[in-house]
Amino acid sequence: MKYLSELMEDKQTLLFNKTKTFFAFSPEQLEKGKKKHNIKNTKLVSMGGGMICPKENAETLSEGLEKIYKDSILEDIKLHTINRIVLRELANYECFYTGDISDCVENLRDYPGISKKLIVKIFNKNYNKYNTY
C-alpha cells in the first residue's frame, strides 16, 4: 500500500524538471543545481525547505505542487478504502503504541470524508488487534 508521498513523487519530479527546481543546502549544491538546469543570470527564489527555482517559475511551481497534492489525495482514496488509509496512518504514526492519534488526524486533515471522529472510531475498533504491547 503506497503512502501519499509515494503517489506524489513522480509527478513532483516532472514538475521540478519543468520549472527547473532543485534543492540546495550549501553553496556547492546551489552551483550544482544551477549547472544541472543550465541556469545563468536568472533571479532565483527560495521556496522553503531548501527548494529553489527561477523566480519566473515560482507561481507555476507553487500551483503545481498544490494540484499534485490534491489530485494525489483523490488517487489515494480511489486506490484504497478510507478505512485502510486511516489504519495505514494510525500504524505509521504508532498511534496504537502511544495512544495518541493527533499526528494521524493532522496528516489526514485534507482528506474528504475523513474526520477526527472517524479516526477515533477506527482507532477504537482496531486497538486490540494492533496494540501488541
Task: Label the model's feature ranges.
Residues 1-133:
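Soluble, non-transmembrane alpha-helical interaction regions
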